[in-house]
Swiss-Prot record:
GO terms for biological process: translation. The gene is rpsU. Residues 48-61 have a biased composition (Basic residues). This is Small ribosomal subunit protein bS21. Keywords: Ribonucleoprotein, Ribosomal protein. Residues 48-70 are annotated as: Disordered. It holds the Pfam family Ribosomal_S21. Belongs to the bacterial ribosomal protein bS21 family.
Length: 70
């Protein structure tokens, strides 16, 4: 669990911003959202496979030469 020590004469919103940034860096909120409901192992594998296919197709699209515009 990330923690932030509030420095002397530091505004609360600055400390809160540092805390939010540390939580985001650790990935706590994304893990919490993923564990909110039970996901069957087959559904998890299917979701991860679909994400991998999407990433691969996106990578291939970015590597292709753009069409000639004339």
């Amino acid at each position: 669990m990330p923690h932030v020590k509030v420095k002397e004469n530091e505004p609360f919103d600055v400390a809160l911003r540092r805390f939010k940034r540390s939580i985001e860096k650790v990935g706590l909120l994304t893990e919490l959202r993923a564990r909110e409901f039970y996901e069957k192992p087959t559904a998890e594998r299917k979701r991860k496979l679909a994400a991998a296919v999407k990433r691969q197709s996106k990578r291939l699209r970015s590597q292709q030469l753009p069409p000639k515009m004339y």
